[in-house]
């Protein structure tokens, strides 16, 4: 199976490679990294090859900046690009402050600005996938803002799914707190990326969330940096991204005195 990663020069790529190396059942034979920065993608490809070799994984890693060659005969195409790089991220995280809004690249005005730059590029890439990849190839979107980008892909008729690590992060944290394997956790995960809530945590057919809210309310609130009283009132655990709304003024004050994520 061939997987193409568009934005393969990203620092997130080694994390993906680590995950693939621990799941040989995926039967990956080729990982093709595509990125406009040829030097950067070759560096990431070298790291990726060493990681796979250390894990004994047989997949070969190919790198380049030719999108057509990259997606040719691909079974899956994963998108993790940032149009304009960290410079535009810095803009998205700062200009909203001028109008008393949170600066963030997935939600709010910064997220919409990023969507305006990103959606046209993603749709262009998707058309290349439609033309040159295998019939039925899935596009997997990690590119933010995930909800808007994935919706654009679907409305254009592409076979696509948008992924976010919020749900699996909660699944793992709840599993650790309850002393069970993550696969035993069934989440009632509702909302749109990244604005989601966990409204149930089911283990062996029983919802354990009410008990967790009663016994671990402070810990759960600390995880998402929100007031315990809010979680108790909701009866759910919000994504930490919802802090930008539930605690808008507090977060804005923090952003004005701290480095942005792009700077960090």
Question: PLM features: residue spans?
Answer:
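Short acidic low-complexity segments
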Residues: 60-73
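Rossmann-fold NAD(P)-binding glycine/threonine-rich loop
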Residues: 83, 87-156
């Amino acid at each position: 199976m061939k997987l193409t990663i568009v934005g393969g020069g990203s620092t997130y790529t080694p994390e993906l490679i680590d995950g693939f190396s621990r799941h040989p059942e995926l039967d990956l034979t080729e990982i093709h990294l595509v990125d406009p920065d040829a030097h950067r993608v070759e560096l990431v490809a070298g790291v990726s090859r060493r990681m796979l070799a250390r894990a004994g994984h047989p997949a070969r890693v190919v790198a380049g900046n030719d999108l057509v060659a990259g997606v040719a005969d691909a079974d899956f195409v994963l998108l993790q690009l940032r149009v304009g790089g960290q410079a535009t991220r810095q803009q998205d995280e700062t200009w909203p402050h001028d109008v008393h809004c949170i600066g963030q690249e997935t939600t709010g005005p910064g997220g919409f600005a990023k969507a305006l730059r990103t959606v046209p590029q993603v749709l262009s890439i998707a058309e290349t996938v439609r033309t040159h990849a295998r019939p039925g190839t899935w596009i997997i979107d990690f590119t933010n803002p995930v909800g808007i980008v994935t919706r654009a892909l679907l409305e254009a008729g592409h076979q696509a799914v948008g992924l976010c690590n919020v749900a699996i992060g909660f699944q793992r944290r709840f599993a650790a707190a309850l002393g069970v394997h993550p696969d035993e956790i069934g989440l009632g995960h509702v909302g749109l990326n990244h604005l989601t809530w966990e409204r149930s945590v089911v283990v062996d057919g029983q919802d354990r969330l009410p008990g967790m809210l009663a016994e671990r309310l402070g810990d759960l609130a600390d995880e998402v940096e929100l007031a315990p009283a809010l979680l108790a009132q909701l009866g759910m655990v919000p994504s930490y991204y919802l802090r930008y709304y539930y605690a808008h003024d507090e977060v804005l004050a923090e952003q004005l005195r701290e480095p942005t994520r792009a700077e960090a």
